[in-house]
Amino acid sequence: MIKKRKIDIFLVFILVLSAALNLYGIWNSDTDNAYYTAAVESMTQSFHNFFYASFDPAGFVTVDKPPVALWIQTLFALVFGVHGWSVVLPEAIAEVISVALLYFIVKPTFGKTAARISALIMACTPIAVAVSHTNNVDSILVLCLMIATWLLFKAVRKGKIGWLLGAFCMIGVGFNVKMLQAYMVLPAFLLFYMIGAKTTIRKKVVSLITAVIVLAGVSVSWAVVVDSQPESSRPYIGSSQTNSVLELAFGYNGIQRLTGQNGAGGGGTSSSDHDQKNQQQSGDIENNSDSANGQMAPPSGAEMPSGGPDSRQGDVQSGGGGPGGGTGGMFGTGTPGPLRLFQSELSGQASWLIPFV
């Protein structure tokens, strides 16, 4: 006999609240990042641009992120047209789904009350709502990691390796949303499985090694395909120094994000400066189209090698197509250290949660 599941009316209320907070006002919002919106518009014009996440219609240079979140935004744009709200909509929806997932992650272990409180706090967290009102890819990254967490809890409770492989596969998908930032959960995942899984140490180690192999394969799948293509037949990898996705992942979107440093040097800039620079770069590309060969000039701050765009060899200076240079907190994330969350750059985002710790 099929057991009927009762709908938790409190969860419904929380999800309605989350949807209202995340969706309200996006139709007249000017908070979309023009840099990524320009990329989405380019990606709607050809499969070549779609696959490579090309910033410009000519397919000359990519954005500074892998393509998964932009693929989703592009699909929405193909349905609804390219508008500020249509590229923000998937981010808002992702946040609502994440709230629901948190409820279902917490409930089996800690009960309904804890699940409701957790979901409500996430739904009302100011920075989460603010980020979901932009087309920056963070909300989709959070959704990927929430799915991974849900699968991990399933793996621990059921003792099936398939759930564990699914969890690490989703982290790999997250890598293709925002690269190394997806790996921030890895230490917690590994430790939780080692402590929580009800099996022998040997089986735990073998399972985790297998899961890490799956993670690595999914993570580098798109990067390997792109880097294996002739440089003359694909866009230049924006913000990379060597026209390589893997170098972008471990350089500009990896170590430089962690340390707040830019290897190309230059003065420090705030995160708002980067947004303005992104918009300026999109204008620079549109205004520097080469009518003779149909190619676009690279964004300001990027310098293509001599010999024309077809050569596509050499270094890109100052970070290429994405947010540009700076040292010491170039991403507005404070100075590296154990108290980083309490510095002025991040305290406004993190301090709201201190009472719940």
Regions found by a protein language model. Name each.
Residues 1-357:
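Membrane-integral, polyisoprenol-dependent glycosyltransferases
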